Amino acid sequence: MDSLINEIKSAQSSAELEELRIKALGKKGILTAQFALLKNLDEEEKKEKAKELNQLKGEFEREWTLKKEIIATEELHKKLLEEKVDMTLFAPSKGVGSAHPVMITMERIVDYFVSLNFAIKSGPLIEDDFHNFEALNLPKYHPARDMQDTFYFKDGMLLRTHTSPVQIRTMEKETPPIRMICPGAVFRRDYDLTHTPMFHQVEGLVVEEEGKVSFANLKYILEDFLRFMFGEVQVRFRTSFFPFTEPSAEVDISCIFCHGEGCRVCSHTGWLEVLGCGLVDENVFKAVGYKNVSGYAFGLGVERFAMLIHAVSDLRAFFESDLRVLEQFR
């Protein structure tokens, strides 16, 4: 037994200790074998021998437990030293995600109008003909429908070609005054340097009692908005046509690249077209059951703004998932 105790004291690892435990108390261990022999003794001898063996077993277990705690502490300390981290070392760089340039631009646009208490509204991407066309003064066979190549489903439903249906759905549910914007994805069958089948719009609508809203209000807010987005630019309004507004206008800003002098980007005109607007047509109000109201609406392409802000000539670069391109906009 003294030999086992000495071996415990000289053990250097948990593995050595475990071997000693098995040697003493395992199925074929020294003490286990001694306990098995007790059955061959008479009662008096068995009692004396059992007492002696229990004392030896207790001594072994105390020494073994004490040594186990010492070795466990030493092994933990050694492990911590081996696995310690030098906080002064440079960590390997990891790729960090960032917002997409189109989403950054959309958020900036939305932030401006939210600051003026415009509510943000949303609607379904799959629309019916009424909300996408008819309610917006575009009845069946109207020639203006040719302006938008539409994705149709077999049941007559379609992918919305603009976010204007959200305005119709909002007016169906709410009564004036209305002050809203509807940012979101839209879809048209077009794909070239300046068009993709899916892109994003932000449209706005203001409806008040008749006589409370004029083109002057629309002009003021859009001029302020465009200077918020592009800095101190000149803004001009050109008469145009949209089925859902009357009168209608296209809005241009002085070229932010040549400052109005004329360059390739602005086709040497000194102006960049950025959005469309107008006073809401009476037929649109009739479609939603509004009477004695007036209002204005406007709409812009988010990608168009992003292209101008970041000087990108090919719209498709935003959607081709080329990290070499997208990393430039962090």
Swiss-Prot record:
Location(s) in or outside the cell: Cytoplasm
GO molecular function: ATP binding; magnesium ion binding; phenylalanine-tRNA ligase activity; tRNA binding
Gene (name only): pheS
Enzyme Commission designation: 6.1.1.20
Source species, domain of life: Bacteria
Keyword ATP-binding among UniProt keywords: yes
Statement: the UniProt record of this protein carries the keyword Magnesium: yes
Keywords, alphabetical: Aminoacyl-tRNA synthetase, ATP-binding, Cytoplasm, Ligase, Magnesium, Metal-binding, Nucleotide-binding, Protein biosynthesis
Full protein name: Phenylalanine--tRNA ligase alpha subunit
Record's catalysed reaction(s): tRNA(Phe) + L-phenylalanine + ATP = L-phenylalanyl-tRNA(Phe) + AMP + diphosphate + H(+)
Disulfide bonds: none
InterPro entries the record matches: aa-tRNA-synth_II, aa-tRNA-synth_II/BPL/LPL, Phe-tRNA-synth_IIc_asu, Phe-tRNA_ligase_II_N, Phe_tRNA_ligase_alpha1_bac, Phenylalanyl-tRNA_Synthase, tRNA-bd_arm
GO terms, biological process: phenylalanyl-tRNA aminoacylation
Cofactor binding summary note: Binds 2 magnesium ions per tetramer.
GO cellular component, one term: cytoplasm
Binding site for Mg(2+): E246
Cofactor annotation: Mg(2+)
Subunit structure: Tetramer of two alpha and two beta subunits.
